[in-house]
């Protein structure tokens, strides 16, 4: 501290802003002969006897430090990787340049070293390694885990993305407003996290699953356009398509807006943001719109990955007169795979094994091949009559050298299993379109659905506007009512939105 004060570096509590004249990622050949100060963490130490080399790392890069002074070498011999140090020294040109890093043309000859924080000799795991590290160990030593370059860069990328979103929403006239975190519970799709009230024993706050009610209040209060990077808390089991615990979403609301107005905002913000941070191809708006029922029929799921070219077709009518008992009285879904006849029996057995696993739950997976010769072979070929073959070719697009997978079950079950089989086929056959983000809207969701207990419940939430307005609620069968609810889907992942009900 005294040394820093004597050099006129101001209050010691502000020294982090005065600790270095350069970062570890910005020095180059133009800085040769300059005296610089650097601070960071030791990534690697190489003791060659006559001199010691240190790779010094900070958020911005790595600089090689050379220690050839005897006194400094004694000090350096006690240093360990991941120790935090401050050095001053002279920039010189490297004799053996490293083209893999931006600072590879230079090195710094140290004339002073200050240890800011010494690390233990043995780390619980290597920081920058391709080896798998146990998650519980990573979480226990999170401060070390976050030094990992990939993870570190992901967090910085998130920061840049959030700034881009904020700037774009501001450009579009949205005001950023933070809504309360502690609130009353409201009906949502998952369980609430509850916080006991100290002042009111026996009563609880709920952490918001989404800022639904508060943003409605903002619109009623006359705020025209609102947004926030909203924290959301959902107490649900972790699944591949869920974000359990805590996550953040771009949340926005508009006054006096139609569904198309919302789409325009999404199509302004989303492609712009994606293109700024990826080299992949990004769909431009307007995004295609797929009705919910069509999505379920063609893809077996309401968040389809459009990079996968396979579709599901209902071929029940083809087998109406079939004597294949396994199909009798069932809904039959088919997935036609171009060039699928090239695969051997092992592939089909593996797909059957997947379909009948506990994860999927199919009773079986029928299949057959349509060879180049025009012959139907393998699997259930003996049940594919000439009439069925003709229908599959003429009405459903079965082409030569293809294979067909059949799922037979009760309607909803067949639909669900076919959706999972389609996804798995896309993965195993490497059919997904490469380096592209495919967007679509899933629209016309049912307002209500039957619960497992047979009662009518909201499909998404009670805040959405029914198509046909309040009159539809009074005159239509609840299960026939569609809602102004729509999901934005990208490569099989989903973002949910809807048009708010404003009538009572």
Model-based region annotation:
Residues 15-500:
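Class II aminoacyl-tRNA synthetase catalytic cores and aaRS-like
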Residues 2, 7-16, 497-504:
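Conserved small/polar residues in nucleotide/adenosyl-binding loops
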